[in-house]
Amino acid sequence: MYYPLLSIALGSVLGAWLRWFLGLKLNPIYPQIPLGTVTVNLVGGFIIGFAMAYFAHSDLNPNYKLFVITGFCGALTTFSTFSIEIVTLLQSGKWGMAMLAISIHLIGSLIFTCLGLATYYWVAGH
């Protein structure tokens, strides 16, 4: 019971530290498009794709999958989870569902970000 939790926790710590470090080092280079954020999203997408394929053909203990995918990639970027879900839909020939999911994720995230900002300003009385 504790090994899955520890696997996720350790992966999360390392993923979060890497995200923070890359943000510190890369975001100031070109602030209009934060390169640290772009980097973690692209690297996270690559890692989760590689890991999903690898673990599908591996006899390794499932805790390693939890460490890499749920922990590390989850903390590094949630974009990697989104990416693998969309690719899975596309591989299944569900193009319409993939496009719908992309639209919901992207537009929905922007809307909810705006709602979060508006809620703060409303609650704070600004």
Swiss-Prot record:
Q: Where in the cell is it found?
A: Cell inner membrane
Which superkingdom? Bacteria
Q: What is its main location?
A: membrane
> How would you describe this protein's topology in the membrane?
Multi-pass membrane protein
Key words, A-Z:
Cell inner membrane, Cell membrane, Ion channel, Ion transport, Membrane, Metal-binding, Sodium, Transmembrane, Transmembrane helix, Transport
Which GO MF terms does the UniProt record name?
fluoride channel activity; metal ion binding
Q: Which Gene Ontology cellular component terms are annotated?
A: plasma membrane
Is Cell membrane among the key words of this record?
yes
- Transmembrane regions listed in the UniProt entry: 4-24, 33-53, 67-87, 97-117
Q: What is known about regulation of its activity?
A: Na(+) is not transported, but it plays an essential structural role and its presence is essential for fluoride channel function.
The residues that hold Na(+) are: G74, T77
Q: Which family does it belong to?
A: Belongs to the fluoride channel Fluc/FEX (TC 1.A.43) family.
Q: What does this protein do?
A: Fluoride-specific ion channel. Important for reducing fluoride concentration in the cell, thus reducing its toxicity.
Protein name as it appears in the record: Fluoride-specific ion channel FluC
Organism of derivation: Acinetobacter baumannii (strain AYE)
